[in-house]
């Protein structure tokens, strides 16, 4: 990990390597805050598992998963004259990447909860399913749901 200050300026987090964004996103929920070495280890194990299961380059799998699970449009709340209605908006590329990484790590975290499988195995499964675009990935399901809501509010 680079220990870089990617939050200091507006678009600087776009320069952050995608694997590190994934690692940083894993450090969520109070008890895991700041435990970056733990997150690095999880990502490393997940990459090894991906390589064993698919024989593909794990970084390519991560990139495909992020591309497939980033929602293309979203519904935002627009309030005018006391009436709040949802309006469909396109999502900027940077937010697509951030949202995709968030959905992937959330899916891995939820599937690892109260489960024998380690979070590394769950993360590997989530990434492989999302890279394939299969609907038993949490991130793909959420993305479809977000886009369906946006389509209804066009």
Swiss-Prot record:
The keyword Ribosomal protein applies. Keywords: Ribonucleoprotein, Ribosomal protein. One of its GO terms (molecular function) is structural constituent of ribosome. GO terms for biological process: translation. InterPro entries: Ribosomal_uS7, Ribosomal_uS7_CS, Ribosomal_uS7_dom, Ribosomal_uS7_dom_sf, Ribosomal_uS7_euk/arc. It comes from the Eukaryota. Belongs to the universal ribosomal protein uS7 family. This is Small ribosomal subunit protein uS7. It comes from Nicotiana plumbaginifolia (Leadwort-leaved tobacco).
């Amino acid at each position: 990990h680079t220990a870089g200050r990617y939050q200091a300026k507006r678009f600087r987090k776009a320069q952050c390597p995608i694997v590190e964004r994934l690692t940083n996103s894993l450090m969520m929920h109070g008890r895991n805050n700041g435990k970056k070495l733990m997150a690095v280890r999880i990502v490393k194990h997940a990459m090894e598992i991906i390589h064993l299961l698919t024989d593909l380059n794990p970084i390519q799998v991560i990139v495909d998963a992020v591309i497939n699970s980033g929602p293309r449009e979203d519904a935002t709340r627009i309030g005018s004259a006391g009436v709040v209605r949802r309006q469909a908006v396109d999502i900027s590329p940077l937010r697509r990447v951030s949202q995709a990484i968030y959905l992937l790590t959330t899916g891995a975290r939820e599937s690892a909860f109260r489960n024998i499988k380690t979070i590394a195995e769950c993360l590997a499964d989530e990434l492989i399913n999302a890279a394939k675009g299969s609907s038993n990935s949490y991130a793909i399901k959420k993305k479809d749901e977000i886009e369906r809501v946006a389509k209804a509010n066009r």
